[in-house]
C-alpha cells in the first residue's frame, strides 16, 4: 500500500528591492538623424518654374518663391533659352545656397545649408527630358563644386512622406500640406519645395511634432542612404 505524502505549503518569499542598481538598458533601436544645418533649402527644379523654399533652422523664418527665367509671355521680350537658361538657373540656385537669396547681397555672408532636391521624374520624353536632365546635372555639379551637401529625393518618396502614398497627385499633395502643416499653396512647385524642407527637418530632427509611421520609414531610408553614400560623415 502506498502512503500519500502530506501537502506542505511553501511560503512565498518577498525579494527586497535593492536601491541604487541601474535599470536594464533598453534594446530599442535609437533613431539616427543627420546634424542640423543653419538652413534647409528645398528645390523642385524646372526649366520654366523652379520652386524653392528656404528655412532658417535657428529662427524658424521661411521664405519661398518660384524662379522663372521667362515670366513674360510677350513676344516683345526675348526669352532665355538653351545654355543661357541653364546658367541663369545655376547662378540663382548658387546664390540661394550660399547667401540665402536669389540675388547675391552686396555684403552677404556664406550660410550653412542642406539642400533637399527632388529627383528626376522619368515621365518626360524627347527634348524636354533631355533638357531636364541637363538642368539636373548642372545643378548637382554646382552644389558638388561648392561643397554643399544635398540629398536627392525621388518624387514617389516625397509623395509618400507627405500623403502616405507614393502615387499621390498634385492636388492631393496640396491638400495634405494644408491639413498637416496648415500651409496653403496655390503653386505645386512651391508646395513640393516646402514638402522637401519638411523632410529635411525630419532627417535632421528639427521638425515640429511627432512623425507618422510612414514618415519615420521614409526618414530612416533617407538617413541610411546618406550614410551609405557618405561613410566618412556618418
Q: Residue locations for each model-derived region?
A:
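Phosphate- and other anionic-substrate recognition elements at nucleic-acid/protein interfaces
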Residues: 2-234
Amino acid at each position: 500500500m502506498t502512503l500519500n505524502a502530506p501537502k506542505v505549503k511553501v511560503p512565498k518569499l518577498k525579494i527586497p528591492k535593492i536601491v541604487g542598481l541601474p535599470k536594464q538598458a533598453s534594446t530599442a533601436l535609437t533613431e539616427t538623424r543627420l546634424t542640423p544645418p543653419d538652413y534647409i533649402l528645398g528645390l523642385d527644379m524646372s526649366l520654366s518654374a523652379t520652386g524653392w523654399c528656404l528655412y532658417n533652422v535657428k529662427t524658424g523664418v521661411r521664405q519661398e518663391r518660384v524662379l522663372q527665367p521667362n515670366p513674360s509671355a510677350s513676344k516683345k521680350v526675348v526669352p532665355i533659352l538653351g545654355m543661357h537658361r541653364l546658367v541663369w538657373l545655376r547662378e540663382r540656385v548658387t546664390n540661394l545656397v550660399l547667401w540665402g537669396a536669389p540675388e547675391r547681397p552686396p555684403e552677404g555672408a556664406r550660410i550653412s545649408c542642406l539642400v533637399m532636391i527632388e529627383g528626376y521624374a522619368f515621365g518626360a520624353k524627347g527634348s524636354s527630358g533631355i533638357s531636364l536632365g541637363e538642368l539636373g546635372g548642372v545643378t548637382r555639379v554646382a552644389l558638388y563644386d561648392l561643397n554643399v551637401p544635398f540629398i536627392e529625393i525621388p518624387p514617389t518618396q516625397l509623395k509618400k512622406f507627405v500623403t502616405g502614398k507614393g502615387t499621390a497627385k498634385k492636388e492631393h499633395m496640396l491638400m495634405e500640406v494644408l491639413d498637416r502643416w496648415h500651409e496653403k499653396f496655390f503653386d505645386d512647385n512651391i508646395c513640393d519645395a516646402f514638402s522637401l524642407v519638411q523632410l529635411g527637418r525630419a532627417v535632421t530632427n528639427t521638425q515640429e511634432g511627432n512623425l507618422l509611421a510612414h514618415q519615420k520609414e521614409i526618414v530612416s531610408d533617407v538617413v541610411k542612404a546618406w550614410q551609405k553614400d557618405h561613410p566618412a560623415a556618418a
